[in-house]
Structures are given as structure tokens and as C-alpha cells.
């Protein structure tokens, strides 16, 4: 477990020797607008590291790794992880390859889960029961740590097989383009004046009703960001309709 600035710096220096790493995060997002980082997992083929954000004050070594284009970063279904990295560090992993995207271009389901991927490639059935536990509580349990480590331990070896398979299929350039598009989309910030578009059936409203909803949705999103509170904890969607 990496719990100090010195330990993080030492880890990141060692990681620079490797061409690729697997990354994952554990976070909590129940009442907050922004995800609350609970743990970062990293595997470079030699070192499995669990990085405890509660003990780190200097993130510059990890930021340097995230932006180091000589090190490919692999994630699986990493859209939410990218949001965590962007909100916490102001950085996105570069370059990034998402194994769920690779798998989709090889004919797997679009939302192919990590456990299903691991079972197909290794025959191991992962226990995912820890996924919804409290990652902000300390100390983390042994089962939580084992669960978190497995997410990167299995990911990195599988990436090699998936890269070969995707290249053989002729879809690798398209898959890499899709990974870049995912990063671009994650950097797009929803403008408060467009928040009404995320409200179910808003298109059915009449002109004056829609104008009112647009103002309310704008205000709700601004308040949610200002107070770091999930939008439905500011005002529930059904209550917007009643107004």
C-alpha cells in the first residue's frame, strides 16, 4: 500500500522502466456531484501498487506518469475512471487504451464486463462482491485490497492478447480512434444552460414549460457543482416537473 509522498515518488520512478501499465480506481459517488477517490491501482508487469489518496499530498510524480506518452495506459471501461483522474489531478492518462473498446471491435458485447473478460481469457471467476463497499473507510479490509489488486493484475496480461486479436481483425486503428474520442468526450463539460437535455421527456413540454424547466435545470446544476452535491439531492427531477 502506497501511503506517503516518498513511496509514491519511488513507485513512479520504477514505473518509468516499463512501456505499459494497467490502471484502475475505486471511488464513492453516492451524495456528491464529483466522484470521491478512494484508491488507485497500478500494475506495470512487476509491481502491483495500491495507492491510498488519503496519505498523499504531492501528486506530481503520478501526474508525470499520466502525461508520459512513452508509457501506454490500459483501463477497462474507463470512462468513469477518466472523470476521477480529471477531477482529482487535472490530467487524463496519455496515451490511453480501453480494453472494453478493443473487445467490442473483436465482437464481444459493447458493455463487456471485466469479470467476463477475465473468465474468458484466464478461466478465473472473480469475486466482485467488494465493488460497492465503502472505499473511503479506513482501514481497507484484506478482501477489498485483494479485489482492487486483481483489477490490474489480470488486466495487463490480457491487454497483450486483445491487442494482437484486434490488430489481426484489422480494427486496431479504429479502436484506438475510439479510445481517443472517449477521452475527448470525457473532457467536455456540460454547460448549465444545456442541463435540461438530460431530463427525461423534457422534449414533450410546451414552449413556456420548457423555458421554465431550462432555468430550473441550469440553477440545479450550478448549485450541485458549487456544493458538490448530486443533482437529485439539490432538487429531485420529479420535483422540477411539479414546479
Question: What are these regions, as identified by a protein language model?
Answer:
Residues 1-243:
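DEDD superfamily 3′-5′ metal-dependent exonuclease/proofreading module
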Amino acid at each position: 500500500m502506497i501511503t506517503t509522498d516518498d513511496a509514491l515518488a519511488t513507485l513512479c520512478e520504477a514505473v518509468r522502466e516499463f512501456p505499459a501499465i494497467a490502471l484502475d480506481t475505486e471511488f464513492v459517488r453516492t451524495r456528491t456531484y464529483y466522484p470521491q477517490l478512494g484508491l488507485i491501482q497500478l500494475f506495470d508487469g512487476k509491481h502491483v501498487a495500491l495507492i491510498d489518496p488519503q496519505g498523499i499530498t504531492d501528486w506530481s510524480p503520478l501526474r508525470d506518469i499520466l502525461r508520459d506518452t512513452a508509457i501506454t495506459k490500459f483501463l477497462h471501461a474507463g470512462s468513469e475512471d477518466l472523470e476521477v483522474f480529471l477531477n482529482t489531478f487535472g490530467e487524463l492518462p496519455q496515451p490511453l487504451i480501453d480494453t472494453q473498446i478493443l473487445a467490442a471491435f473483436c465482437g464481444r458485447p459493447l458493455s463487456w464486463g471485466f469479470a467476463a473478460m477475465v473468465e474468458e481469457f484466464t478461466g478465473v471467476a472473480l469475486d466482485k462482491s467488494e465493488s460497492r463497499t465503502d472505499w473511503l473507510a479506513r482501514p481497507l479490509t484484506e478482501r477489498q485490497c485483494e479485489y482492487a489488486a486483481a483489477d490490474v493484475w489480470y488486466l495487463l496480461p490480457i491487454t497483450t492478447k486483445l491487442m494482437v486479436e484486434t490488430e489481426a481483425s484489422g480494427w486496431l486503428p479504429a479502436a484506438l480512434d475510439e479510445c481517443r474520442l472517449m477521452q475527448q468526450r470525457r473532457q467536455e463539460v456540460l454547460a448549465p444552460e444545456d442541463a435540461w437535455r438530460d431530463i427525461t421527456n423534457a422534449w414533450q413540454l410546451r414552449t413556456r414549460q420548457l423555458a421554465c424547466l431550462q432555468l430550473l435545470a441550469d440553477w440545479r446544476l450550478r448549485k450541485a457543482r458549487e456544493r458538490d452535491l448530486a443533482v437529485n439531492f439539490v432538487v429531485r427531477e420529479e420535483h422540477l416537473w411539479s414546479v
